[in-house]
């Protein structure tokens, strides 16, 4: 293989600079992502203040593969409506721009359906909707605003080993209140601006957190 030509070097430099830019700490908070709001606030604080990308995570890679397979499986099925995958969304919410990416959006004549895919382990049975996932779909509910047709949200859990699938049609009353999400956003913004490390939320995700060696909260987790 040839590695020394000018195109190779150009491509290498462009990609390296892109990831370097994405890994930089944030000096001034201009927006938050749905993931940053949904996950442990301490993890989000470290991501913003310390920078860095968790690209080497085997768990993350596995999730990306599952997402790609599932999105490909639904987007060309006409009986589901017109389906779009990896749908970017950005909207002001409680004084700051919130950015997200919906896994799949299926639109038919009578329904506007938001679908989020999650990988899990159901070896000992389904453990219920994770709080971070509930926050995520609740944010998408509000960020997509009112629609002329019926709006629905689905959480799809897939067992990483067996392929077992559990589909949850989120009832409107299960969606978190705007105020609860707004308070969470304001807390994260305030923690960033005051340079104060927020309280952690120990849970299953601590196992895969790239900041667990500095946080130590995972030691208090029961998972």
UniProtKB/Swiss-Prot annotation:
Pfam family, one: PDDEXK_1
InterPro entries, sorted: Cas4_exonuclease (IPR051827), PDDEXK-like_dom_sf (IPR011604), PDDEXK_AddAB-type (IPR038726)
Gene3D superfamilies: 3.90.320.10
Name this polypeptide is given: Uncharacterized protein ORF223
Organism whose genome encodes this protein: Acidianus filamentous virus 1 (isolate United States/Yellowstone) (AFV-1)
Lineage, opening ranks: Viruses, Adnaviria, Zilligvirae, Taleaviricota, Tokiviricetes
């Amino acid at each position: 293989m040839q590695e020394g030509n000018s195109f190779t070097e150009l491509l290498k430099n462009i990609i390296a600079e892109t990831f370097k830019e994405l890994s930089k700490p944030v000096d001034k908070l201009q927006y938050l992502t749905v993931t940053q709001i949904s996950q442990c606030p301490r993890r989000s604080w470290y991501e913003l203040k310390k920078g860095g990308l968790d690209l080497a995570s085997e768990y993350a890679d596995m999730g990306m593969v599952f997402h790609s397979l599932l999105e490909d499986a639904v987007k060309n099925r006409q009986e589901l409506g017109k389906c779009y995958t990896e749908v970017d969304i950005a909207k002001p919410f409680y004084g700051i721009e919130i950015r997200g990416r919906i896994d799949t959006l299926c639109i038919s004549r009578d329904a506007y359906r938001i679908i989020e895919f999650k990988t899990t382990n159901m070896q000992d049975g389904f453990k219920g909707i994770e709080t971070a996932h509930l926050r995520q779909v609740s944010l998408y509910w509000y960020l997509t605003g009112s629609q002329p047709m019926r709006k629905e949200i689905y959480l799809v859990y897939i067992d990483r080993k067996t392929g077992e699938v559990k589909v949850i049609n989120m009832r409107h009353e299960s969606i978190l209140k705007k105020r609860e999400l707004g308070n969470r956003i304001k807390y994260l913004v305030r923690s960033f601006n005051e340079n104060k490390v927020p309280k952690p939320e120990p849970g299953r995700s601590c196992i895969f957190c790239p900041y667990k060696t500095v946080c130590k909260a995972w030691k208090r987790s029961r998972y």
